[in-house]
Amino acid sequence: MLKHFARWRLGSQLLKGCAAPVRQASKTSSAENLIAGTEEPQKKFVNPFSQPAPALSNDTISENKEERDKRLKVLQLEADIAHQEGRRVPSLEFFKDHHWEHVLTLPTKSARIKYFGYLWQIEMKKEADQRKKAERAKEAERRVAEMRKEREENTHIIYGLGHTSLFLRIYDTTINHWQNNRLTRAMQFAPKMVLDCSYDEHMNNREATYAAKQLMMCFAENRMNDEPFDLHYCNTQMDSRCMQSLQRYIPTMHNPEFPINLHSKCFTELFPKQNLVYLTPHCREDLVTYNPDDIYIVGAMVDTMNNEPLSLAKAKRLGLRMARLPLDRYLQWGSGSGKSLTLNQMINIMLDLKKTGDWDTALKHVPRRKVVQNEFQPRREKDHWSTGTRARKLNMRIDHLFDFDENRRQATSYATPQNVRQRREGLEFQLDTWATGKQKKKQRQN
């Protein structure tokens, strides 16, 4: 052991002795340069992540494409074999191009199996919907045949739905046109609101898909409202994952007659900068009242993994005013529940705030699972509901029990008791006959 330690000390001393002349030589060379009047150029730190990626040659691109095609064929063969074996994998006809693009990004086989199972569930739901649709079509044909037969047998006028009636049938296309017309009117007179779609690079595939679904729900919730916003989707890139998913949800959004505002430009180029207010949960200033002259901006981002204050940084970089919803002032959050809200919940909150100006009404769109229930809520309603559910299962009537309990509670709290023992008039207290039963005997004899 001592021999190894001595060898280690000797080796370290030799290394130090070899390194010392190098440092001295570097010092002497720098001193000579200073005497000569020439300075050494300072080394600049280069961040490799800030440099653009080197351009690939055509041969490299073709090789990568060939490797990708080979890997895609292998994955398709894997999915086909698993489907033939009866596993939870959809058929190859169900797969779309964006499905295979996502499969190529999955690193492990277990991740591919989970994704295949998810697609298999979607395929089964679609097949079930098609079967139900076919059954409904057969039922409709049967009803039409019965109606025609009834008309042939009865020559008199038949009144009712499907027959002679004062009411006109309102088709789904009519409701659709009416709601689109309401959005067109909102583009002319309603306040504006912006959804910032510039966070695609900060989301993974799943988050981008969730963001696209929430953007679709924002459009639907805004269109169904009586007083909708003039909604603008800014910083949109049609080749991004979020916009491609949104196009699958709304296939007609690029039609010229469709009432949606898509802008590839930033909102600072479209609206006055002094009217813009960025709604971000990371700032310290609460939004007290709704101002119809302001244009509120919501960042279209789903941050399940990334919790960085990106919207705050962007608002500061653009020099915009910032505000956050007064959630802590009006709500008591439960333990372990995050304060994040979806995009459609934000739109619903702002719609109700614009209509009523009341935060209590607007914040009803916050999920109840995230907040603590109010203590002043009467517990009797919960007990009545739970006990009533149990009684209905047992086929019992318990309304009289709750009515008696309610009468007793009101009597003891607000008025004189109705069903409580009261002191009788004309009776004197006698200690010798108290609690002996003699007083009752005297009353009976009298």
Swiss-Prot record:
GO terms (BP aspect): methylation; mitochondrial tRNA 5'-end processing; mitochondrial tRNA processing; positive regulation of mitochondrial translation
Entry keyword Coiled coil: yes
Pfam family, one: tRNA_m1G_MT
All residue ranges annotated as the SAM-dependent MTase TRM10-type domain in the record: 179-373
Modified residues (Phosphothreonine): T60
Main location: mitochondrion
EC number: 2.1.1.-
Keywords per UniProt: Coiled coil, Methyltransferase, Mitochondrion, Phosphoprotein, S-adenosyl-L-methionine, Transferase, Transit peptide, tRNA processing
GO cellular component: a single term: nucleus
Localization per record: Mitochondrion
Coiled coil: 119-158
InterPro entries in the record: MT_TRM10-typ, MT_TRM10-typ_sf, Trm10_C_MTase_dom, tRNA_m1G_MeTrfase_euk, tRNA_MeTrfase_TRMD/TRM10
Source superkingdom: Eukaryota
Disruption phenotype: Pupal lethal. Pupation is developmentally delayed and pupae fail to enclose into adults. Larvae display reduced ATP levels and mitochondrial swelling in the neuroblasts. Strong RNAi-mediated knockdown is pupae lethal, with pupae failing to pupate. Larvae also display reduced levels of ATP and the accumulation of unprocessed mitochondrial tRNAs transcripts for tRNA(Ile), tRNA(Gly), tRNA(Val) and tRNA(Leu)(CUN). Larvae neuroblast mitochondrial morphology is not affected.
One term of GO molecular function: tRNA binding
Residues with Phosphoserine modification: S50, S57, S62
Region (Disordered): 41-67
Presequence extent in this chain: 1-24
Subunit structure: Component of mitochondrial ribonuclease P, a complex composed of rswl/MRPP1, scu/MRPP2 and mldr/MRPP3.
Family (UniProt): Belongs to the class IV-like SAM-binding methyltransferase superfamily. TRM10 family.
Task performed by this protein: Mitochondrial tRNA N1-methyltransferase involved in mitochondrial tRNA maturation. Component of mitochondrial ribonuclease P, a complex composed of rswl/MRPP1, scu/MRPP2 and mldr/MRPP3., which cleaves tRNA molecules in their 5'-ends. Essential for the structural and functional integrity of mitochondria. Function is essential for pupal development.
Protein name: Mitochondrial ribonuclease P protein 1 homolog
Organism expressing this protein natively: Drosophila melanogaster
Gene that specifies this protein: rswl
